[in-house]
Each structure stands twice: as structure tokens, then as C-alpha cells.
UniProtKB/Swiss-Prot annotation:
InterPro entries listed in its UniProt record: AraC_lig, AraC_XylS_family_regulators, Homeodomain-like_sf, HTH_AraC, HTH_AraC-typ_CS
Pfam families referenced in this protein's UniProt entry, alphabetically: Cupin_6, HTH_18
GO molecular function, one term: DNA-binding transcription factor activity
Segments forming domain HTH araC/xylS-type: 202-300
Species of origin: Streptomyces antibioticus
Record's protein name: Putative AraC-like transcription regulator
Superkingdom to which the source organism belongs: Bacteria
Length: 303
């Protein structure tokens, strides 16, 4: 697996689609801070997105989509002066999967959220800006538009297993949005995600994820990436925020935590599978990173 696939798999990324929103005239719907990674896409018309904490609204045109990566309240509206309706109440009145606001049907949005099985905020979301906006006219956005169109068709025509198909398509859309954001705005991400935008760092990350149990050295990674040891160390630290071996330790602990949450393998076997020579060596590293020993974590795994 590559690093992005690895992390999304570790997080057990799942999508959940909400009712669609049809709106017209002057309207505004205010939403509480979402506890998931929220997304919406404008399939018809145009509107404004105003996120709590941001001074300026975002113009959403037909075909645009966005992700909200922080738990902030937000408003979708025709204009900033329109009287807002409570989103919970609006969607509680939804019929046949469609909520309505204002008068008419000038605007049509689909949306939902992504949930994760473990601490996604630290592993993924904190490395993204609070709002990821993908305009329809963005170069190379065809894959995002294809996924959104396919979701729209599943929700509109509702063939067999349409909800399941649409939710899987939403995960496909998320991956394409993340790829596109890395390509067009590499300076707007941080951590390992930023590393994927640097070919040298991305090469090292790929090797680390491909074989985390290997006894990697910085020199060996540098050779694999075809740069000097000092170049790799400096670029990795500057981009990811920690050195290659520090990153490897953290990733090994994440893999260990997953095995402790989901399986019953003895700690010695887990240690061997993630590159530690002994159970005690893994225990020391685990406690240093997560603040508790593996045995306690297995009994009381952290969210």
C-alpha cells in the first residue's frame, strides 16, 4: 500500500450520506459543528458557505464540493443577510431523502460525512486546512465530478443497493479530493500529507509504509530515494515535521495499536510483525508514544 491508502485503511474510513437539500429564493440553513469529516457538493445552482471562524464566505458554484475538516458550525445560504433556519429542524422534515429551504428549487446539494475508527483528527484531519474547497473548474477535477455524478444518480434513481454503492462512491470521491488538493495546494497541507507532495520525501514514505518491519536507516532510505543522507533528513524533517525514523516509530505504534484493538495475537508476535526485536522494546516505544503500555491499551483502547 502507499501511505495515503495505508492511513485511510487504518482509519477504517466510512461514509454516511445525509438527505439532499433543495433550496430557492432567499434562504439560509445553519448547522451545528459536525463531529465527522463533512462534505457537500452543489449539483445545481449556486450558494454561499460561511464557516464559523472564517471572515469571508466561500462562493459555491454548480459542480463545486468541499470538505470541513474541523468541528465548526457553518451556514449554507443564498446571501449573508437571509434569516437562518436550524439545520437539524430542516433535515428532520426531509421527505423522500430531500430537505427543503426557502421557496423554489434553484439549488440542489448532496452531502454527508466520513467517520473513522480511530484518532483521525491527529493522523489525517489536522494535516489538512479547515476547509478544502474544490471548484468545478479545477484542472484534473474530472474524477471528482465523475464520483459526484455517480452518487447523484444512485440517490436519484435508487436502484438495488443504491445506498451502499453511493457510500462507497463517496469514499472514492474523498480520495480524489485529497489527491487533487495535494496536487494543486501542497503548501496548504502539513505532516505526512505534505510529504506526499515532495517526490523525495514521498519515495521515503512509500518505502517505510511498504515494509515497516524492516530495520531502516536514514542512509538506506536516502539511497532508495536517490539522494544524499543529509538531503533526505533535512527535507523529511522540514516537510513532515519529524525525522524519517521518528515517523517510522510512530507508524509502527499505530500498526501495533490496530492489532491490539482488533486481534488477540500475543505481544511478542506483534512486536516481530512491526519490526521490534522483543516485546519489551515494543512496550517501551508504545508507552513513549501513546502514554500507556500495550496491555492496558488492549483492555481500554483509546478512540
Amino acid at each position: 500500500m502507499d501511505p495515503l491508502e495505508d492511513v485511510l485503511t487504518l482509519l477504517k474510513t466510512r461514509s454516511h450520506l445525509s438527505a439532499s437539500l433543495v433550496a430557492g429564493g432567499r434562504w439560509a440553513v445553519v448547522f451545528d459543528a459536525p463531529q465527522v469529516l463533512k462534505f457537500n457538493a452543489v449539483r445545481r445552482g449556486a450558494c454561499l458557505l460561511k464557516v464559523d471562524g472564517d471572515d469571508e464566505p466561500i462562493d459555491l458554484a454548480e459542480g463545486d464540493c468541499y470538505l470541513l475538516t474541523r468541528p465548526r458550525s457553518f451556514t449554507l445560504c443564498s446571501d449573508l443577510e437571509a434569516a437562518p433556519s436550524d439545520g437539524g429542524a430542516v433535515f428532520a422534515r426531509a421527505e423522500d431523502g430531500i430537505a427543503r429551504a426557502g421557496q423554489g428549487d434553484d439549488v440542489f446539494l448532496i452531502g454527508g460525512g466520513f467517520s473513522f475508527a480511530t484518532h483521525a483528527q491527529e493522523l489525517l484531519l489536522d494535516n489538512l486546512p479547515p476547509v478544502v474547497h474544490v471548484p468545478a473548474g479545477t484542472p484534473h477535477a474530472e474524477a471528482v465530478q465523475w464520483a459526484l455524478t455517480a452518487i447523484d444518480q444512485e440517490l436519484t434513481h435508487q436502484p438495488m443497493a443504491s445506498t451502499l454503492v453511493a457510500e462507497h462512491l463517496a469514499v472514492v470521491m474523498l480520495i480524489h479530493v485529497l489527491r487533487l488538493h495535494l496536487e494543486r495546494a501542497p503548501d496548504a497541507v502539513s505532516g505526512w500529507l505534505a510529504g506526499l507532495a515532495d517526490p523525495v520525501v514521498a519515495s521515503a514514505l512509500t518505502f517505510l509504509h511498504r515494509d515497516p518491519a524492516h530495520s531502516w536507516t536514514v542512509a538506506e532510505l536516502a539511497s532508495a530515494a536517490a539522494v544524499s543522507r543529509s538531503t533526505l533528513a533535512a527535507r523529511f524533517k522540514a516537510t513532515v515535521g519529524q525525522g524519517p525514523l521518528e515517523y517510522l516509530t510512530r507508524w509502527r505504534i499505530e500498526l501495533t495499536a490496530r492489532q491490539l484493538r482488533e486481534g488477540s495475537a500475543p505481544l511478542a508476535a506483534i512486536a516481530h510483525s512491526v519490526g521490534y526485536g522483543s516485546e519489551s522494546a515494543l512496550s517501551v516505544a508504545f508507552k513513549r508514544v501513546l502514554g500507556m503500555n500495550p496491555g492496558d491499551y488492549r483492555k481500554h483502547p483509546m478512540p
